[in-house]
Amino acid sequence: MGKYKPPAERKYGKGVQSCQRCGSKDSVIQKYGIYLCRQCFREVAYELGFRKYW
């Protein structure tokens, strides 16, 4: 193996936010301070008070 440089820690952007439920970093919903990925949001949306998903 050669030299290895670890990826830089991000301070902003898509790589910073992660889902609080599963830890996924893609398609995180930040609105209203939810911080859930779209898949987890669909599962718990009704419990959070969103009436569309039931």
Curated annotation (Swiss-Prot):
Cellular component aspect of the GO annotation: cytosolic small ribosomal subunit
Single GO MF descriptor: structural constituent of ribosome
Binding positions (Zn(2+)): C19, C22, C37, C40
Keyword flag Transmembrane helix: no
Known cofactor(s): Zn(2+)
Cited InterPro entries: Ribosomal_uS14, Ribosomal_uS14_arc, Ribosomal_uS14_CS, RIbosomal_uS14_euk_arc, Ribosomal_uS14_sf
Pfam families documented for this protein: Ribosomal_S14 (PF00253)
Biological process (GO), any one: cytoplasmic translation
UniProt remark on cofactor binding: Binds 1 zinc ion per subunit.
Keywords from the UniProt entry: Metal-binding, Ribonucleoprotein, Ribosomal protein, RNA-binding, rRNA-binding, Zinc
Self-association and partners: Part of the 30S ribosomal subunit.
Function comment: Binds 16S rRNA, required for the assembly of 30S particles.
Family named by the database record: Belongs to the universal ribosomal protein uS14 family. Zinc-binding uS14 subfamily.
Protein's recorded name: Small ribosomal subunit protein uS14
